Curated annotation (Swiss-Prot):
It is a lipid-anchor. Residues 39-59 are annotated as: Disordered. Keywords: AIDS, Host cell membrane, Host membrane, Host-virus interaction, Lipoprotein, Membrane, Myristate, Viral immunoevasion, Virulence. The lineage of its organism: Viruses, Riboviria, Pararnavirae, Artverviricota, Revtraviricetes. It comes from Human immunodeficiency virus type 2 subtype A (isolate CAM2). This is Protein Nef.
Length: 260
């Protein structure tokens, strides 16, 4: 990733950080539709490009990395349901995603190992996630942002179930989730009180977590070399784990993780 690429992406990523910081508790609604209207105005003259969206770009090929049971891209129905959930979670008085195009700026593509590593380092360079409290809302904002700005289909961001450190299940994504104790810090951890006008993510994060832990994003460059999620918790990959079905199901049951 050269200097010119960094300059082009610098401002959009700064916008991502601002939106993540503005994300707060509660639901959201009609802003997504407003974004769509804004995007339609901005894409005049480029309809041909948008109508020919493809899944070109780098794809992971099975066998490129050993013991990497990648998830297949989400089925169209699942992707539509996911996007509907995103729309349901955007409130008319919430501007967290204002300025994000409603349609991707570039052709759609699936996440790849190289792309995940590159995006992880770029986000770290711009200070986008380090130490930021995790929440389901911020998770969705990151998904939507990377899909609209980078064309990355939002079916890749998953973490191990915990408790404890949550490792990314997509090999190449270098951001893990680390539990922190917020009993003493409360809202002082992120000091912009105007930005956080409702419940602070430090207080709501644990409600998103099945173990009641408060999590923050933390960069770990070693995740590019070692597939921690698969090494530590192969049962979470189900049939792709290589384990006998009875064994991985028993392990999931013992940890209280639902499976189908």
């Amino acid at each position: 990733m050269g200097a010119s690429g960094s300059k082009k992406r610098s401002r959009p990523l700064q916008g991502l950080q601002e939106r993540l910081l503005r994300a707060r508790a509660g639901t959201c609604g009609e802003c997504y539709n407003a974004l769509e209207g804004e995007s339609l105005r901005s894409q005049e003259g480029s309809d041909r490009e948008q109508n020919s969206l493809s899944c070109e770009g780098q794809r992971y090929q099975q066998g490129d990395f050993m013991n990497t049971p990648w998830r297949a891209p989400a089925a169209e129905g699942k992707k539509n349901a996911y996007r509907q959930q995103n729309m349901d979670d955007i409130d008319s008085d919430d501007d967290d995603l204002v300025g994000v195009p409603a349609t991707p700026r570039v052709p759609l593509r699936t996440m790849t190992y190289k792309l995940a590593v590159d995006m992880s380092h770029f986000i770290k360079e711009k200070g986008g996630l380090e130490g930021l409290f995790y929440s389901e809302r911020r998770h969705r904002i990151l998904d939507i942002y990377l899909e609209k700005e980078e064309g990355i289909i939002a079916d890749w961001q998953n973490y191990t179930s915990g408790p404890g450190v949550r490792y990314p299940m997509f090999f190449g994504w270098l951001w893990k989730l680390v539990p922190v104790d917020t009993s003493q810090e409360g809202e002082d951890t992120e000091t912009d009180t105007e930005t956080h006008c409702l419940l602070h993510p430090a207080q709501t994060s644990r409600h998103d977590d099945m173990h009641g832990e408060t999590l923050v994003w933390k960069f770990d460059s070693m995740l590019a070399l070692k597939y921690e999620a698969f090494t530590r918790y192969p049962e979470e990959f189900g049939h792709k784990s290589g384990l006998p079905e009875d064994e991985w199901k028993a392990k999931l049951k013992a940890r209280g993780i639902p499976f189908s």
